[in-house]
């Protein structure tokens, strides 16, 4: 990894996801600049991949807003990650590369291209924003005027 790469687009992107340990042991997925879809049969780890992304980026549902969903996802991650970890490679719109690593029960560790820890926050208020939707969430949005309007408002405020 170099200190900076030529930006391939004018937006931030997730370059790859790698899992060490657990159900997805050894998986490495490279992502394209645009829309990425995870497709596979029942029980192949699609939900686990999606939730691993959400977990590494510290974008889990709020425990105070949706406690039941938060706890269900924590159980899923603990069962599927075990003592393993998730690592993401991120590229900013300016072509700067970062890695984010996270194990269950820990906070995300962000490092620069040289592997040195940097003081960048991951999560809802970080400059590297991301929207991640499960199939059920997409169905909820499609079936609810309220969800559609709230998402459109949130996107228009950006």
Where in the sequence are the language-model features?
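Short helix/loop capping segments that flank catalytic or ligand/cofactor-binding pockets
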Residues: 26-27, 39-40, 46-48, 98-99, ...
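Generic beta-strand/beta-sheet core signal
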Residues: 20, 32, 38-41, 52, ...
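Nucleotide-state sensing region of NTPase/ATPase domains
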Residues: 76-132
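Phosphate-binding glycine-rich loops of NTP-binding sites
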Residues: 35-71
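Active-site-adjacent structural elements in folded domains
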Residues: 22-24, 70-73
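Active-site-proximal structural scaffolding
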Residues: 10, 31, 42, 46, ...
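Extended, charged alpha-helical "arm/stalk" segments used for dimerization and assembly
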Residues: 116-158
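Charged catalytic cores and adjacent phosphate/nucleic-acid-binding surfaces used
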Residues: 1-43
């Amino acid at each position: 990894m170099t200190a900076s790469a030529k930006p391939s687009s004018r937006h931030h992107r997730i370059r790859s996801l790698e899992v060490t340990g657990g159900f997805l042991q050894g998986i490495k997925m490279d992502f394209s600049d645009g829309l990425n879809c995870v497709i596979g049969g029942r029980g192949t780890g699609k939900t686990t991949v999606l939730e691993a992304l959400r977990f590494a980026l510290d974008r889990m549902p709020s425990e105070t807003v949706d406690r039941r969903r938060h706890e269900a996802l924590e159980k899923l991650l603990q069962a599927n990650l075990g003592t393993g970890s998730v690592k993401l490679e991120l590229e900013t719109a300016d072509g700067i590369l970062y890695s984010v690593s996270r194990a269950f029960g820990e906070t995300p560790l962000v490092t620069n291209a040289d592997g040195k820890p940097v003081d960048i926050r991951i999560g809802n208020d970080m400059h590297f924003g991301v929207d991640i939707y499960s199939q059920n969430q997409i169905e909820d949005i499609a079936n609810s005027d309220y969800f559609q309007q709230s998402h459109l408002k949130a996107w228009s405020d950006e």
